[in-house]
Amino acid sequence: MANHPIDQELTSPAEEELTPREIVAKLDEHIISQKNAKKAVAIALRNRTRRKKLDPEMREEIYPKNIIMIGPTGVGKTEIARRLSKLCGAPFLKVEATKYTEVGYVGRDVESMIRDLAVISMNLVKQEFRTKVEETAKQKAEEALLDILLPFPGENKHGSGQITGFATSSTLADEEDRKTHFLETREFMRKKLKTGKLDDQEVELDLPNPSVSQVPMLQVFGAGNLDDLDNQLQNVLGDILPKKNKKRKLKIPEALKALEESEAEKLLDPDKVQREALRRVEEMGIIFLDEIDKIAGREGKSGADVSREGVQRDLLPIVEGATVNTKIGPVKTDHILFIAAGAFHMTKPSDLIPELQGRFPIRVELEKLSREDFEKILTAPCSSLTRQYEALLSTDGIQLEFSLDGIQEIARIAYDMNEKHENIGARRLNTILERLLEEVSFEGPDLPESQRKVRIDGKYVTDRLQGVIQNKDLSQYIL
């Protein structure tokens, strides 16, 4: 293995020793209500920390307890899993169960979700490594660019783009004087580079071509059940075909960025990154399997339900523990945490095949959102919807202010609409706020300065939404 200028240990992000109570508190910052679901995922995450502290023999025997969340759309199922993955810096993949077909049918097989998770893990580790070496890469990129702009006589490693107007000291006889003059000129160029005075200049860089694994012509094998063949072909051709550099003409800021990426790639130890990515996907990976209820066949049904049952049977070995070949090597799925979710309007969890039910031992029912929950969703989270709209419109100089009675009226309308029509949970708030703020969002940039302060109170909400609410047919399609 080649020696690398920087050989930093790649480890997972500093995982805090969070207790289940602390995990729930962090989830509370972003998600309203759903205490039972938060407790279940908090315990699952804490058990991973506990497992790491055991001796290797016992550690191998302890498997994650997969979770199935039951509840209507828009109550926080996906958000809980997403926030959980951010807490532990784990590779996280959200997939829809309906996208997969059983082996033998046209479409993606369930093993492809593990391959996708492996790619996510690899990218996560690479990004963390690049962050660690960012300063070093910037310094090296700056020196490389200066070598191009003002090279030593006969030296130009990356490309051409020498800027004229600076003496190359051919007229200076003394070698020491020439060197001093060159260094002074180089520092002068460095100052111009840092202050942006060279941003309009163009340079020609000799940069590595994208690897053959990224060549689009091979993606014909990317569909269906041929992912393994695709990976093998790309890996083989990547080793056989020579890697060539490509000359590109770029402006200074773009050239600097390209060189930074190139230098960071040189500092990267591929074997170490691959090992860490493999460890993380096996030990920390989380797969959120949404719409699990859509592959549950109802009793007495036939036809398409046969294929649905096939997908369930294909899921069994993946959830239980299997080995899947991926781009980063064979991945064991034994300790990947699976969180399934579904509304189960037309079906119930018992409609899943018994073997799959047994592999999701923890079941959590999420509560329907109340009017008070809607009020909290609008105001409590640090990035609540009201704060998002205030920030967006402030870029046009519009000062948006939501009063308490305005918040209460929006929450009441959202709750009533969910009761009268389809219950889409908190997503109803997005629809209502877009309709409510449509006028100010459109007219805002053209308003005079005196009219750029807009107060959203109960009367404002009623005036703009009353007509739509009263018309049942209209409210069904607009709100």
From Swiss-Prot:
Record's function text: ATPase subunit of a proteasome-like degradation complex; this subunit has chaperone activity. The binding of ATP and its subsequent hydrolysis by HslU are essential for unfolding of protein substrates subsequently hydrolyzed by HslV. HslU recognizes the N-terminal part of its protein substrates and unfolds these before they are guided to HslV for hydrolysis.
Instruction: Tell me what organism the protein belongs to.
Output: Leptospira interrogans serogroup Icterohaemorrhagiae serovar Lai (strain 56601)
An example Gene Ontology biological process: protein unfolding
Q: What is the top-level taxon of the source organism?
A: Bacteria
Designated name of the protein: ATP-dependent protease ATPase subunit HslU
Which family does the similarity line name?
A: Belongs to the ClpX chaperone family. HslU subfamily.
Entry GO terms, CC: HslUV protease complex
GO molecular function terms attached to this record? ATP binding; ATP hydrolysis activity; peptidase activity; proteasome-activating activity
